[in-house]
Amino acid sequence: TVLATGGIGGLYKHSTNFPSLTGDGLDVAKKHGVRLEHLDYVQIHPTSLYSKKPGRSFLISESARGEGAVLLNGKGERFVDELLPRDVVTQAIEKEMEKEGSDHVWLSFKAVPEETIRNHFPHIYEECLKEGYDITKEPAPVVPAQHYFMGGIYVDHFSETTMDHLYAVGETSCNGVHGKNRLASNSLLESLVFAERAAGKIAGREDEEYESNYDAACCG
């Protein structure tokens, strides 16, 4: 049996996950005495597009800030170095929101050429337009949102849990590769790499054979 029930974003007011992801696999595992690990390892992304509409939050990538977009408070003032790590920027935004009694801050693209916005960030541009904000002319409201769950059902390097013949893959699992704060674009490790390792183990592939093939593919 393989558990692949995703993360826990549906438990949060703002999340880039689908609302249906509510940690069901964790609940099943806990009820059967399967070990869970690092349930407090939750990554919050600093900039999701603020919206009063229910459902999944739209993520505005760090690359926008890398191109020159800056965070502003309600007075139009910068309050943080936008290129600091996600958790640091998130904390700064939360602090500013609390200070101002606001439910969002602003992301200004004023320093980003319009051509760059349209060519490099067309999806962001279109999503902001849907909410009524033309980021070539005005800032867009943003708010931190739950983005990734590094904790989960404890698994080994073949995605085996502490229960015989039970595996967990993807975001519902915790194999330790992400530590406490996942690096951007690394989520496929659990979804693809460790899922493939689990499939190999289930199929009866010998550990030594698998490791040999793995080493050859990586280093040969």
Regions found by a protein language model. Give the residues of each.
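Short hydrophobic core segments
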Residues: 1-6, 29, 167-170
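A glycine-rich dinucleotide-binding beta-alpha-beta segment and adjacent secondary-structure elements
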Residues: 120-173
